[in-house]
């Protein structure tokens, strides 16, 4: 007697072990877990073949060998089907309904109606389009960071190496490596520029010819080409320790400023970044001025007067670190107009100091002013919030509010500031279009809305309306959100904090509500037959500081006005919830339906009577107007007849026969 196990026949030698598959016994797994695992026909064939071989060798190897083989088959099968068992996370249905299907990227090349005759050429162009960078994308931003590093390196170290010969000669191998690495990055950036898309009529251009023409006809292209001219060949004519021949590399500065601009847009701390950026500019200006001061001192002669750098033959001033720090110190004192430096002696020294003073007055005054403005902007939020607190304090003192209430209000303000809840979301987002505001609101409040039972599977348009109408509210410890018997005008969704359902004494707790819970959603629908009506059935009190989202009844009714089908669905879902909880009076529902029918019939009768009255009035007006019209027509006919008779008599008197008869 043989028995099938997962499609495999067992040998007679193993019939005594037919109650469960050996692999399942060895692993301690249940039979239903193995049977529920998806597997293909190829897996069954493989396992069947291996087990068949095991059955042949079973008399020689025994029961343990067969178990090991079947166990190995189970492991292999589980590994092979691992990827098939893993399901991709499903996209959220709320966002799916709101965003709709994804649009495929359309380029200007695809939209101009020109197709390629050769399929291979078309495929090649498609491959090239894959390498077009979106200037708003992350890859482009990462490349800006890469290219900004060699630009900053050249701007800081080229001038220092050109002025401080010890710096150049002491590490010239390191400088050669860094120089040519930066040159490679510059050349790569030239090709990246040729593959960087731009927007035309709102679409990203990926046509290589358009990209090339758009870049080549700009001034930046000429500067980029000039920055990679191999001026290093001049090394063969002059000394290798002449880094000034590479000053053309400084022309690639635009990339560094572009990186700074995009970082300022992307960062969550723009004020801190702006201040850091200005500090960097100050340091670079001071650094350049220090290098130029050292170069002027070298050209005039070290130690020839009190203004130039001291004689380098003095051991105290003859090493590189002291040279640079001394020049940096002199540059800082001069540019910040602090003074306390030796006065100039020669004319060229006077001119240089005058130029430095102008830079210090104009540029540094501007920079320091910007820093002060940024710091003021950073404190603007705090100042505005403090002004609100002061106004409330003044009001409470004027109205002689108790000290306990005053302390409670101050603690509430402190909680708002500490937890960064002072931001007015509507004021911040008012400059965005409605579509973006709705999408941001959905991303922020999505997890909260999914907790509300009546809003499951509602229309995307209604969901957008409701999301935009959610209003955050913060309650202090001990505050009542609602009291028993109050008319329900809002529903609440708990974002953070804990609420307690308490007795009338305010102390005894019946239940505890935490983040994600919601209440009051049924009362704002005015469902007929509800035993609760539209009144609160419990006292709900905040245990600590609680953040809630509030949706008022008026806002809900305003939103569902344009969605009558959604309103019916919400009411039906509310009735289902009340029926499950035993809070729906079906007799009252039937009675209310009869009352509604009677009311509708009464309204119909009233409307019919009004219609009859209006029709009779219109008919009377029509009859009167018709009589007046007939009278006017009769008058006109009479006048026409009289006029015709007068014309006939006048024509007869003027005829020739009558004239001849009248002659004697």
Curated annotation (Swiss-Prot):
One of its GO terms (cellular component) is ciliary membrane. The keyword NAD does not apply. It is a multi-pass membrane protein. Residues 1-49, 641-664 are annotated as: Disordered. It holds the Pfam family cNMP_binding. 3',5'-cyclic GMP binds at residues 520, 523, 536-537. The C-terminal coiled-coil domain mediates trimerization of CNGA subunits. This is Cyclic nucleotide-gated channel alpha-2. It comes from Homo sapiens (Human).
């Amino acid at each position: 007697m043989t028995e099938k196990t997962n499609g495999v026949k067992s040998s007679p030698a193993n019939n005594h072990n037919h109650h469960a598959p050996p692999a399942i016994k060895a692993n301690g797994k249940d039979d239903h877990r193995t049977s529920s695992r998806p597997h293909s026909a190829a897996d069954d064939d493989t396992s069947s073949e291996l087990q068949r071989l095991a059955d042949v060798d079973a008399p020689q190897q025994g029961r343990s060998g067969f178990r090991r083989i079947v166990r190995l088959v189970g492991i292999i099968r589980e590994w092979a089907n691992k990827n098939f068992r893993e399901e991709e996370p499903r996209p959220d249905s709320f966002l799916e309904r709101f965003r709709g299907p994804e649009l495929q990227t359309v380029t200007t090349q695809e939209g101009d109606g020109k197709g390629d005759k050769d399929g291979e050429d078309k495929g090649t162009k498609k491959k090239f389009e894959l390498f077009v960078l979106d200037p708003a994308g992350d890859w482009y931003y990462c490349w800006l960071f890469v290219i900004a590093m060699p630009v900053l390196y050249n701007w800081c170290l080229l001038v220092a190496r050109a002025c401080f010969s010890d710096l150049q000669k002491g590490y010239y191998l390191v400088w050669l490596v860094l120089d040519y690495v930066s040159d490679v990055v510059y050349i790569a950036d030239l090709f990246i520029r040729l593959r960087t898309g731009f927007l035309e009529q709102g679409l990203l251009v990926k046509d290589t010819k358009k990209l090339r023409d758009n870049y080549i006809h700009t001034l930046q292209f000429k500067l980029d080409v000039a920055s990679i001219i191999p001026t290093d060949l001049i090394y063969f004519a002059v000394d290798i320790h002449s880094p000034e021949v590479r000053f053309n590399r400084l022309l690639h500065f635009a990339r560094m400023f572009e990186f700074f601009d995009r970082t300022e847009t992307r960062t969550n701390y723009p004020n801190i970044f702006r201040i850091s950026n200005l500090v960097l500019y100050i340091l670079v200006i001071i650094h350049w001025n220090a290098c130029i001061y050292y170069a002027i001192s070298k050209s005039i002669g070290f130690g020839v007067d009190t203004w130039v750098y001291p004689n380098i033959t003095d051991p105290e001033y003859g090493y590189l670190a002291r040279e640079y720090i001394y020049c940096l110190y002199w540059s800082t004192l001069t540019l910040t107009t602090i003074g306390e430096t030796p006065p100039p002696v020669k004319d060229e020294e006077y001119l240089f100091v005058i130029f430095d003073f102008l830079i210090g007055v104009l540029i540094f005054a501007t920079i320091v002013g910007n820093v002060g403005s940024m710091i003021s902007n950073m404190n603007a939020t705090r100042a505005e919030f403090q002004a609100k607190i002061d106004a409330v304090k003044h009001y409470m003192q004027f109205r002689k509010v108790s000290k306990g209430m005053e302390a409670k209000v101050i603690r509430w303000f402190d909680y708002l500031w500490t937890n960064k809840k002072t931001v007015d979301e509507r004021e911040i987002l008012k400059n965005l279009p409605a579509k973006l505001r709705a999408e941001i609101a959905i991303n922020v409040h999505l997890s909260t809305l999914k907790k509300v039972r009546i809003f499951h599977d509602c229309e995307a348009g209604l969901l957008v309306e409701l999301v935009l109408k959610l209003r955050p509210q913060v309650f202090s410890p001990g505050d009542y959100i609602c009291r028993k018997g109050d008319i329900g005008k809002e529903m609440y969704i708990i974002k953070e904090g804990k609420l307690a359902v308490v007795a009338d004494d305010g102390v005894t707790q019946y239940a505890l509500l935490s983040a994600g819970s919601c209440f009051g959603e049924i009362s704002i629908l005015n469902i007929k037959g509800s035993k609760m009506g539209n009144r609160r059935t419990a006292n709900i009190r905040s245990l600590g500081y609680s953040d809630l989202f509030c949706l008022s009844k008026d806002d809900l009714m305003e939103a569902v006005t344009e969605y009558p089908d959604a309103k019916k669905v919400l009411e039906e879902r509310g009735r289902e919830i009340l029926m499950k909880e035993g809070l729906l009076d079906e007799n009252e529902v039937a009675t209310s339906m009869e009352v509604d029918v009677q009311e509708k019939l009464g309204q119909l009768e009233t409307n019919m009577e009004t219609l009859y009255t209006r029709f009779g009035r219109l008919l009377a007006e029509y009859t009167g107007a018709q009589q007046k019209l007939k009278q006017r027509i009769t008058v006109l006919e009479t006048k026409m007849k009289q006029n015709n008779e007068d014309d006939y008599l006048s024509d007869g008197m003027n005829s020739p026969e009558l004239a001849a008869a009248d002659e004697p």
